[in-house]
């Protein structure tokens, strides 16, 4: 489907928007030397969870009742898993994870919605899968794009074809043990043509909602999921062959067993 005049204007407008470009580019820095300190060497402030309280004001105690609602159980057991074993995922495991994290659902009345919220239903977030270990002969290691409309993984190329060393994509050695690294990118103009500069917040909100869905789905399976911010954006964008004037890496989540 071709792009309309409004979309072409939005693309041009984003490419010329120095403020948004500068904000996104500044966030690409990964502070590896500091954040990779062993826990024993962490500053004390890193070990403390801070809360905001209005202790001089009256408060109302909120009840928490027992519930058998599935979502309550999933949120209570949600966790970040980092102990990967290089075991490959099945197509069914990947398919279900994507369907219930960011897939599309058609209702009996013909209406369509996705598993995650998106401001104005603009859906600027795209998902790519960098598969390292697979238990299916139908899923070769390499780079894929998730086609939401067809619920398929489109095989783009092997992860060595672009000349990018796969070991340089992440800042942490343990991240290389994950079966799949799912990369969330932003096609900025899709939201900007409706929400202008405010769109950057909405795009980040959408990516967060999507990854939380992945966490919740994994809570009911034997999969391990962890949101991962230590990606080397430039290397990943090179691997995905993105035109970074239009589409850039936001974040990633790792999945394995």
Can you describe what each PLM-predicted range is?
Residues 1-189, 194, 207, 226, ...:
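N-terminal accessory segments that position/regulate proteins before the catalytic core
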């Amino acid at each position: 489907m071709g792009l309309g005049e409004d979309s072409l204007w939005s693309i041009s407008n984003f490419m010329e928007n120095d403020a948004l470009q500068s904000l996104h580019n500044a966030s690409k820095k990964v502070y590896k030397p500091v954040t990779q300190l062993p826990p024993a060497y962490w500053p004390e402030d890193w070990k403390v969870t801070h809360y905001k309280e209005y202790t001089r004001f009256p408060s109302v105690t909120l009840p928490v009742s027992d519930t058998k609602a599935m979502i309550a159980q999933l949120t209570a057991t949600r966790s970040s898993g980092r102990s990967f074993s290089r075991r490959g995922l099945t197509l069914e495991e990947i398919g279900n994870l994507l369907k219930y994290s960011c897939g599309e659902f058609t209702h009996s009345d013909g209406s369509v919605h996705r598993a995650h919220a998106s401001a104005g239903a603009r859906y600027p977030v795209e998902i790519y899968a960098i598969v390292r270990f697979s238990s299916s002969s139908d899923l070769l290691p390499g780079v894929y794009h998730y086609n939401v409309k067809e619920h398929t993984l489109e095989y783009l190329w092997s992860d060595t074809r672009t000349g990018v060393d796969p070991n340089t994509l992440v800042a942490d050695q343990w991240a290389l043990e994950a079966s799949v690294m799912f990369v969330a990118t932003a096609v900025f103009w899709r939201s900007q043509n409706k929400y202008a500069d405010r769109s950057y917040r909405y795009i980040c909100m959408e990516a967060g909602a999507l990854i939380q869905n992945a966490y919740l789905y994994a809570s009911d399976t034997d999969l391990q999921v962890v949101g991962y911010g230590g990606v080397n954006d430039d290397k990943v964008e090179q691997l995905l062959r993105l035109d970074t004037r239009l589409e850039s890496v936001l974040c990633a989540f790792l999945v394995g067993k």
